[in-house]
Amino acid sequence: MATYFVGDIQGCLDELLLLLERVEFNREKDQLWLTGDLVARGPKSLETLRFVKSLGNAAVTILGNHDLHLLAVSQGISRVKEKDKTAPIFTAPDSEELLTWLRHQPLLAVHSEYDIVMTHAGISPQWNMATAIDCAREVESVLLSDKWVLLLENMYENYPDTWDVTLSGIDRYRYIINAFTRMRFCHLDGRLDMECKLPPQDINSDELVPWFELENRLPLSHKVIFGHWAALMGHDGNNVIALDTGCVWGEYMTMYRVDDGKYFTQKAIEQ
């Protein structure tokens, strides 16, 4: 049995299938862990959802910001973004089944054997593992309740930007969602910055640092594997591995076999 982690697919199914073929992935005994954002700008978002769902227990996937946006669009809360290729999902005969399946996916998954925690964007530097897990399960329970549409209606804000155990209601849920699915940089005092999307090397300010480099970040018992931030181009350090390497932007898709620490890459196919 082998366990593979792969960065954001964003509808780039062909590249994923090539990687799985290269490593001779066997759904009967291997596992594929996906860092979220199954859908968005790639050409096969619908097919990607169908494929990952078809893997059953052989796949572990989590919710990314594009996945949550897809759910919001399905409820008329937001519109399909101009460059997204997700419209076919809403007219597919299995649309409701796929969207319900997606809504049942977690924000955080733990691989106990290898002491790895996987989220889409990372873990708030103000959380330890116990808090991160509790916060993920808290929002996941709302997504599975009759309040899920209300939650998605109110997630599109950048505040609150700092964690406080006294946060409650939609403010609390919004911080949790932003930390797990949108976070990149933090201010030196731990506040989340939701505006800057530059590569870290292009930042001129001393006030912003990647969330995983914050000096007073709480220590975690597990290594964090995440996607979301293509500009990191596969950063491996600070007890984190960033697996989004910009396939949807014409770069490549990265897969990591945790059993032996080997990486596999697939160049983006020209569309």
From Swiss-Prot:
Gene3D superfamilies: 3.60.21.10. GO terms for molecular function: bis(5'-nucleosyl)-tetraphosphatase (symmetrical) activity. SUPFAM superfamilies: Metallo-dependent phosphatases. Keywords: Hydrolase. The keyword Cell membrane does not apply. It comes from the Bacteria. The keyword Hydrolase applies. It catalyses: P(1),P(4)-bis(5'-adenosyl) tetraphosphate + H2O = 2 ADP + 2 H(+). Belongs to the Ap4A hydrolase family. NCBIfam families: apaH, PRK00166.1. This is Bis(5'-nucleosyl)-tetraphosphatase, symmetrical. It comes from Aliivibrio fischeri (strain ATCC 700601 / ES114) (Vibrio fischeri).
